[in-house]
């Protein structure tokens, strides 16, 4: 029923080195955020052939 014993719970998270949070610029909210989304998705799109690349593609 369970994949692996509960003794292994949180193994990977425990192993990863702690990285301190960075200070970042505040995100836009409401209308301004939607405007940014719209621009990102529909306005400055690069015409490509074949399969569409996802928003998180790294190539």
UniProtKB/Swiss-Prot annotation:
The keyword Aminoacyl-tRNA synthetase does not apply. One of its GO terms (molecular function) is structural constituent of ribosome. PANTHER family: 40S RIBOSOMAL PROTEIN S30/UBIQUITIN-LIKE PROTEIN FUBI, RIBOSOMAL PROTEIN S30, ISOFORM A. Residues 23-35 have a biased composition (Basic residues). The modification N6-succinyllysine is found at residue 51. The gene is Fau. The keyword Signal does not apply. This is Small ribosomal subunit protein eS30. This ribosomal protein is synthesized as a C-terminal extension protein (CEP) of a ubiquitin-like protein. One of its GO terms (biological process) is antimicrobial humoral immune response mediated by antimicrobial peptide. One of its GO terms (cellular component) is nucleus. Residues 1-35 are annotated as: Disordered. It comes from the Eukaryota. Pfam families: Ribosomal_S30. Belongs to the eukaryotic ribosomal protein eS30 family. It comes from Rattus norvegicus (Rat). Keywords: Ribonucleoprotein, Ribosomal protein.
């Amino acid at each position: 029923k369970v994949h692996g014993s509960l003794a292994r719970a949180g193994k990977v998270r425990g192993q990863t080195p702690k990285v301190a949070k960075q200070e970042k610029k505040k995100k836009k909210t409401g209308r301004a955020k939607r405007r940014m989304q719209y621009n990102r998705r529909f306005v400055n799109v690069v015409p490509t052939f074949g399969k569409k690349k996802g928003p998180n593609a790294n190539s």
